[in-house]
């Protein structure tokens, strides 16, 4: 949990609903407890006064998160957590202001692109409805990075309609190629 996180309790409740035993870890801690999964929640870490997630990516706890991920541990970032993982260098690309420069708060659909990983291998559905609330969720990367992401099958989720059709009309923030979520090359960071 970082100063300004406001979805940490929501994430705690959601994970408990699925049978996870959770422990909240503060940004100033230096060590992670023994874990199967590290989740970086949404919110506005450090008020998002600089680039979203940039200050949190330099927090003391992030050294342990980086080491955990590099050792093969599973890490997931949601909303501001995604921004933090990008800023920390665990995921490629950047997250920019939304295409129409407005805060977006609504339900959207995403289509799972890659089930060859521990996050989605047991999912029966291909399309999920999620709630989003962000000002800087526009995923962008260079052409070279995009080519590498495609070659390594790193796109986890695409924005889609309820039936799983991927198109620009269902892309709420202008993300390149309608990308809603990505993996690292090893597919242990989402």
Predicted regions, residues:
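N-terminal beta1-alpha1 cap of cysteine-dependent amidohydrolase-like domains
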Residues: 1-78, 84-92, 96-104, 111, ...
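C-terminal and late-domain segments of enzyme folds
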Residues: 13-14, 120-190
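Residues at the C-termini of beta-strands that transition into short coil/loop
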Residues: 26, 114, 161
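Conserved acidic catalytic centers in enzymes
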Residues: 79-80, 134
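Short, flexible active-site-adjacent loop segments at beta-strand->alpha-helix junctions, enriched
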Residues: 81-82, 116
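Short hydrophobic/aromatic residue motifs in ordered secondary structure
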Residues: 82-83, 137
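Alpha/beta-hydrolase-fold enzymes
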Residues: 96-128, 132-133
């Amino acid at each position: 949990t970082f100063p300004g996180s406001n979805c940490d309790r929501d994430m705690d409740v959601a994970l408990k609903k699925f049978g996870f035993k959770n422990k909240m870890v503060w940004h100033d801690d230096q060590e992670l407890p023994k874990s199967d999964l590290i989740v970086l929640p949404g919110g506005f870490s450090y008020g998002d006064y600089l680039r979203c997630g940039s200050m949190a990516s330099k927090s003391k706890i992030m050294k342990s998160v980086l080491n955990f991920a590099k050792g093969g541990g599973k890490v997931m970032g949601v909303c501001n957590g995604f921004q933090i993982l990008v800023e920390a260098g665990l995921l490629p690309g950047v997250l920019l202001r939304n295409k129409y420069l407005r805060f977006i708060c609504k339900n959207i659909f995403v289509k799972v692109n890659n089930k060859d990983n521990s996050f989605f291998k047991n999912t029966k559905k291909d399309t999920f409805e999620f709630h989003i609330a962000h000002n800087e969720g526009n995923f962008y990367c260079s052409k070279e990075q995009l080519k590498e992401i495609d070659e390594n099958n790193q796109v986890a989720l695409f924005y889609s309609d309820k039936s799983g059709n991927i198109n620009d009309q269902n892309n709420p923030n202008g993300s390149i190629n309608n990308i809603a979520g990505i993996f690292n090359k090893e597919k242990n960071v989402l």
